[in-house]
Amino acid sequence: MPPYRSRTTTHGRNMAGARGLWRATGMKDEDFGKPIIAVVNSFTQFVPGHVHLKDLGQLVAREIESAGGVAKEFNTIAVDDGIAMGHDGMLYSLPSRELIADSVEYMVNAHCADAMVCISNCDKITPGMLMAALRLNIPVVFVSGGPMEAGKVVWEDSVKKLDLVDAMVAAADDHYTDEQVKAIERSACPTCGSCSGMFTANSMNCLTEALGLSLPGNGSTLATHADRKRLFVEAGHLIVDLARRYYEQDDESVLPRSIATFSAFENAMTLDIAMGGSTNTVLHLLAAAQEAEIDFTMADIDRLSRRVPVLCKVAPAVSSVHMEDVHHAGGIMGILGQLDNAGLLTTSIPTVHSETLAKALDHWDVTRTNSEMVHKFYSAAPGGVPTQVAFSQERRFDKVDTDREKGVIRSKEHAFSQDGGLAVLYGNLAEDGCIVKTAGVDDSILKFSGPARIFESQDSAVLGILNGKIKPGDIVLIRYEGPRGGPGMQEMLYPTSYLKSKGLGKACALITDGRFSGGSSGLSIGHVSPEAAEGGTIGLVREGDIIDIDIPNRKIHLAVDDATLAERRAEQDAAGWKPAEERKRKISTALKAYAAMATSAARGAVRKLPD
């Protein structure tokens, strides 16, 4: 049996000094020999998805101690992508994922912790902690802070649901008065929690359920609802049990790499495609798979995207549907249940809470179980009161939405689309692939051709859109915004939002080697690989070149002959692969270090040390 890692610092005469320091943290004689569980929190007052986590780490810690473990809490950083959006702050968002993963590794290995409870929530925090968990491969349970309630505003004599993106779009739309913009702004983000749509944070927290590393309801139970407290309480007890099974019973089945296998990654990506999750999840799943030493690639994502239907459409794809509605329809277990019915999942694999996913679905899928407890759990409703306090309300819907024909979650037979919610496109513009969230693309523009309007940065693209330089039929092309070229692979939420503000959301396309917020919609194609800074063809496109986009056939093509491209490449090689215009962008040493090691988006934008 493997010895408890913590014995390195708690046992033996020579560890008297270490034990003395442990005693100074509150440990007693009887605590030495118990599993030491790291409570990996991410509380910060900068981020609404994390502002309520301050006391939740200690809630988990108390449950760990009542179950016979020793809990030690620390915090990671957390960047709010919405606040960092639209300025140089966004350069730090994706690199923060690596910093979070490293900081968890540093703390857990430096202090020889035996297991972890990861309390995450927003965009890069869940992926960073997931990467660390698979890197360390010690028992872990994920429990996130939960989704925000959707904003609501009385608009033209009816109640309209809102989120962050509505505020951004309205602010740039001259049809809205200042008073209307203020009304939307004040109502868009009413509570603590991760932004209310199927954006990156909620997408990733949902995927932890499919990976088997979190409890049912983790992705969809509102941050404000009292039911969410149970997830934190159970996580504290569960992690002690998992630690004992591994260290005292030699049960390797509880380890993250035994749970998050290749099949589990397939399940997670299948879920992502079915619910139209954020394109950022592609980056994060590819990165996490590499930490787990699993050969899960863009080719696998492409394969899955061709056979998985869209079973759930959530904001930004459908503005009236938010995470609170997904939970009301049975949450992630409800979507997984329909995917299982369609034969699209591997359910023989374990989870942290169940012997197999199949057994978990039999108990937690509201269309399969008569359990009063399960139906009550998924009836949790928004409270409708602005608050930053977790578990502060207990409102419920009268009954769960089990309509799989016209409800929020559909069966395969009644799918929103038989074609998946994410697609990988290939062609001479993206030889290693690029990603589009098809769930957010209007059917009228699934095939699109138009002239490229070239911008060497997100900033110049924003100015071009707001100044009326983009016309219907144009393709906005933003380059040198990839992992190396940015550096940091900025999100392009402002350009996509401003296209919508100008009435061009269904009349234009946007292509970039950067990435998109989970809040982006429209014909937005990102992660173009190789990126311009790596010598990708996107760096050879010139103003007015025609680009053909064919989502049904998964193709993207620059209509320029090979000989001309070869001439342009020779010219660019001589000039250097850098933006044609000077960018006023301060690149710190920290960002330069990330850029020096960053790999392509097709590899998850992870770091790679020089050979």
Swiss-Prot record:
One of its GO terms (cellular component) is cytosol. Keywords: 2Fe-2S, Amino-acid biosynthesis, Branched-chain amino acid biosynthesis, Iron, Iron-sulfur, Lyase, Magnesium, Metal-binding. Mg(2+) binds at residues 81, 123-124, 491. The active site is at 517 (proton acceptor). Its EC number is 4.2.1.9. Coiled coil: none annotated. It catalyses: (2R)-2,3-dihydroxy-3-methylbutanoate = 3-methyl-2-oxobutanoate + H2O; (2R,3R)-2,3-dihydroxy-3-methylpentanoate = (S)-3-methyl-2-oxopentanoate + H2O. The keyword GTP-binding does not apply. Homodimer. Belongs to the IlvD/Edd family. This is Dihydroxy-acid dehydratase.
